[in-house]
Amino acid sequence: MWSYILKRLLLMIPTLVGVLTLTFVVIQFVPGGPVEQAVQELRKGATEQGATSFGMRAHTGVDPQQIAQLKALYGFDKPPLERYWLMLERFARFDLGDSYFRHQSVWSLIVQKLPVSISIGLWTFFLTYLISVPLGIAKAVRNGSPFDVATSLVVLVGYAIPGFVLGVLLLVLFGGGSFWQLFPLRGLTSDNFAQLSVAGKVLDYLWHIALPITASVVGSFAVVTMLTKNAFLDEIRRQYVLTARAKGLGERTVLWKHVFRNAMLPLIVGFPAAFIGAFFTGSLLIETLFSLDGLGLLSYESVVRRDYPVVLGTLYLFTLIGLATKLISDLCYVWVDPRIQFENLER
């Protein structure tokens, strides 16, 4: 067991290096970096100053010495290979550097924004599984019934609607866009949150998070529900279930004591992808749409502004979380089904 865990931890290193290397290479060829943006601002300021002072267009060139200072400020005065090795050295120490534009360390920004993304990700993840797993089991037990057909139609329609489209629709309907002002447009708490009672704080938080979570969760039901249904149907048709029924065991006992554990294995394997999807991919769209100040919005703004330390830092963090949850998923796989050995997973 411990040898398997050690091997998996060691394999995380080349994966992280590969992700950082690919991102670093892409950054070298993306136009409009921080130096170019700063030069444009200087040219714009010089033009406006010249037009105001002299009534004519000013010279828009920038002193080469200023450009050299900007490159030194953002670390672009060194060759790419040297910058690459310095980046790997810093990330090996978990030093993510400082933001170009926010005048804070990347770690402090992540710590500030992380609670919002965790809140959205956990709500989405747990609500998806708490609703979809029982629904999938009910559909498997009632396979082919009107209930099965109706719920399949509902979850597939929800799956077909992108989360950001549903979010826009919810804002238009319930956020004061064109109809009812029932929910707030942005943020997770009200301005007077600190003055509210404990019950008032809980209700205020749920009031703010209702629309973002609805937009994030609805499209996630179909995959987990249908996976649960198909896994249970596959197990129900197996010989050991027929044997258990022949012995006189009740349907509930057969379903929960024998079928449930085996049918849950595919779902456990999908936990990391579902968690990371809810934690990052979903939060990126939902946070941007609802102006929630989390890691998703921070990542989006950093890409737009070419704030490379924040881009690399958040990508490094999400990759690390994804690899760790994948390892935890494998451990849960063995915990649910003791017949599976770590030696088999290694092969």
Residue ranges, per PLM feature:
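Hydrophobic side chains within well-formed alpha-helices
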Residues: M1, P34-V35, P80, Y84, ...
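Short, membrane-interfacial amphipathic segments enriched in basic
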Residues: M1-S3, D77-E82, R93-W107, N143, ...
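Alpha-helical transmembrane segments of integral membrane proteins
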Residues: W2-S3, L114-P115, W123-F147, G163, ...
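N-terminal signal-anchor/signal peptide hydrophobic helix marking the start
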Residues: L6-M12, L16
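Residue-level signal for discrete positions within transmembrane alpha-helices
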Residues: M12, K113, S117, L153-L156, ...
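Hydrophobic alpha-helical transmembrane segments of membrane transport/permease proteins
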Residues: L16-E82, S178-K201
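Membrane-water interface segments at the C-terminal ends of transmembrane alpha-helices
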Residues: T23-F29, A68, L153-R186, A215-F221
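An internal, D/E-rich "acidic patch" concept
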Residues: K71-V133
